[in-house]
């Protein structure tokens, strides 16, 4: 693999951001990292790039791998020009031309302008151009679509999808994630979960994982009540060979007392997509009375409608198809 992360742990004081996580990224893989705000996405990026330390674990890159890193908040010398910030070899005509082409796509045209005169958004675009110009083997991108308009985002989608690029990125733009990434890593409850598919696949499999967790907790609660009664007895009533059962009880207690909070990762549809009606149907059910019998037309219907997608509804009964459309419109 290009990157192999083994048993990585990071904490701030008493707060553990991630605990003993492991994952790998192979050549040609495009991986998106998602998590709730404040759970450590950018910190994980910084740790992987050795910008921050970590408590334990190993980070192993393939030998001689060239890595390009886009930070969330890049810093520049305010006196240097855009071209100097992007490229140190101004006497190389071919590379200067490439720099100008990429900067133009990102709407940065004055290459002699001092970086200190640029807005924060313009500086982020210069930083993005700087990473792309160097043509690294492995791209590490923290929020690459921040401060980009629709035209720039679509250009960047095409650029990243050309060739066999290897990418690891953090983004809150679900459309960009769908267009570029073929694997999603979720950082949740200090653990990494891997989903080999797009955002819709991630949502479906994550829901399955949460349902299984709820079932496990409920089962543990039932068993916990029984074991708690046993633990409350006098020690002599338990028997002398029950140490293993006591240990198992405390492990069971941890599971039974878990609380599943609303840990849903909410990625945004960037406001630059105005004009496209995008919506999600999640577990929609619809039934009606048909001459005294229950007629089901939708049963846990789940679908994410993507930008520019065109879908037709077919069936045996035209009125039922209309009901489906009406039901979707009512949720608009």
Model-found features: residue ranges?
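ABC ATP-binding cassette signature C-motif
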Residues: 1-217, 267-323, 329
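Intracellular alpha-helical coupling/juxtamembrane segments of multi-pass membrane proteins
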Residues: 206-238, 242-248, 252-258
